[in-house]
Amino acid sequence: MHGEGITITCSQCGVQYTLDEYGKLSAVNVETKFTHVPDWFAWERECVKKEIADGAYQMQAPVDIYMLVDTKRLYHVGEGELSHNAQGFLLKGCDGKLTYDQKPIATYSLNSDFFWYEIGDMISIGDTKALYYCFPRTKISVAKVRIAAEELYKIAKAEKDQKKA
């Protein structure tokens, strides 16, 4: 999914909706199925869950990499590739000097944003040592990645809890 102005477009099927000043959705090129954003979002979540269950979910994108290592500023450290699948996130970059992976169990929620500080769409992963702010260089749905991270966490947590029992 991506948005521009008042229009939201599904990247997968091309369905377009507009959002009015009252928060109501109206379909542009199909019959209206959703009139409220939470309904659309719940439907998106179900689609991502199905993609994960079918083993079809994966994301891979070239990214510009910034790091937050102190409270002073965000440092641009180079370029790389961010991937996400059932095994979690993998970030490689900076001419082979950076490799960071984050398992689904470590991603209860994901910091993602649209047009973050007018730089671009952003996905942030990391740990207590550093946060990696990844700005995709190609069009991907950061909202879908966030939903997938949350759903993969739920699966990993259920598996972990089952092992304890």
Give the location of each predicted region.
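Short, surface-exposed beta-strand/loop "edge" segments at domain boundaries and coil↔beta transitions
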Residues: Q16-T18, M67, R73-Y75, L91, ...
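Anionic N-terminal interaction surfaces
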Residues: L25-S83
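Cys/His-rich short segments
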Residues: H2-T32
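Hydrophobic residues embedded in beta-strands of well-ordered beta-sheets
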Residues: I8, F89-L90, I123
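Phosphoinositide-binding peripheral membrane targeting modules
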Residues: K72-E81, N85-I119
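Broad, structure-driven detector of short, well-ordered beta-strand segments within folded domains
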Residues: H2, Y17, E79-Q87, Y133-C134
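Acidic, Ser/Thr- and proline-rich intrinsically disordered linker/docking segments
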Residues: P104-A165
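Acidic, low-complexity intrinsically disordered regions
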Residues: C13, H36-D39, S112
